[in-house]
Amino acid sequence: MQTKKINLLEKRTFSDELTVTFQFIKQEFKSLIKAFSAIVLPLIFVELFLQSFLLRDILGGAARNAFADGGSGWTTMLVNYLLAIFVFAWLQLFVLSYLRLYTDKYLQQEEIKISFLELLKVMGRNSGLFFVLGIVYLFYVVMGCVIFILPGIYISVIFIFSSCFLIIRDRKLFSAFASSADLCRGQWWNTFGYILLCSLIVSMLGYVFNLPYLGIFLEAYLTGNQPGLFELTLVNSVGTIGRYLMNIVFIVGIGVRFFSRLERKEHRTLLDKIGQIGTEERTESGEDGV
């Protein structure tokens, strides 16, 4: 059974990294969805609950007053925006912790069965530093964009693997940034293209979850009837949950590239195989001597 599992620590080409991303999602689908439902979905429900207040104001015709002269609508929108950032960060922490446990068990040749408690333990151990890293990362990117748009894009790419180093390799804050920049050295355009392609694929797949929106507003246009709060809340829930599910694909894709680039740099799997060959030869020599 173990040999059928995907080894993430392998050197792969650009196209192979994308292929393995979807193969890994397919392989771990049930386990990922169960863990996602227990660890991430409750926070998404909180976000949806807060979003329902904005929808209610819009349908009730109170949106103009709520946003006029510093009304409560701006506060509600800001809270929703900050919560969405937090939920995405929590999702990223969840997926990277899953990849950490998966690779650890694979390398140790254990049965790859990841429990909720194992995930929560890894997430809890790294959550504080992870959120600090996220704040520093956003600060770097925003400052780069303030100076000029291109520096912001450049910084966002070279530090894209910093969270991977933090969670998967137990690097400290600035060591994670330095390691990410080193891993991207000479590969900036390639990495940028990979991130862009992953984003486009995930966005295209995400449109499937937005089809209910199109249906509701098309019906409203044809009939002249305003959508009800229940209908809008329902399609908003489907779209939001679908968006986060698609983000799992994106984060796994970044993780697959991280492992591929890391293997090119460290040759860890190759060294392990050489070590296993040496162990087998010593074992055979001992048996011959007996």
PLM region spans:
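Juxtamembrane transition segments at transmembrane-helix termini in multipass membrane proteins
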Residues: 1-8, 20, 57-69, 91, ...
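Hydrophobic alpha-helical transmembrane segments of multi-pass membrane proteins
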Residues: 78-86, 143-150, 163, 237-245
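A conserved helix-loop-strand patch within extracytoplasmic ligand-binding domains
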Residues: 69-82, 96-99, 104, 109, ...
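Hydrophobic alpha-helical transmembrane bundles that constitute the permease/transmembrane domains
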Residues: 44, 48, 134-135, 207, ...
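Interfacial aromatic "cap" segments that immediately flank transmembrane helices
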Residues: 15-42, 116-143, 157-205
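Alpha-helical transmembrane segments of multi-pass membrane proteins
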Residues: 41-56
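Hydrophobic alpha-helical transmembrane segments of multi-pass integral membrane proteins
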Residues: 37-45, 87, 91
